[in-house]
Amino acid sequence: MRALPVVDADPRERKFVKLGRLAQLAGVLPSTIRHYMRLGLIGADAQTPGGYGLFDPERALPRLRRIQDLQSQRFRLIEIASILVGENGVGAA
């Protein structure tokens, strides 16, 4: 697991959003994103001093949309993980 930068400033002053806001923007439940995180499909970009994950919506939203698109094509999440690795050349980033 990679070390995440800690963001001391108020996340509203930065481009980062918390998981709940990312879920709202993506139109999914926070538990869906947590599940994707457990599977390595998506990861936080930074964290608060308290350890909460922060996400760059410019990076995370396209990835969530890609996951949703692949699911609509009937791919299983394990298959989606392989596809994303192949597309990006890396894991969940």
Language-model regions, residue ranges each:
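Arg/Lys-rich, alpha-helical DNA-contact motif
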Residues: M1-L25, R38-L39, G43-P49, L54-A93
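Short coil turns linking two alpha-helices in DNA-binding domains
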Residues: L29-T32, R38
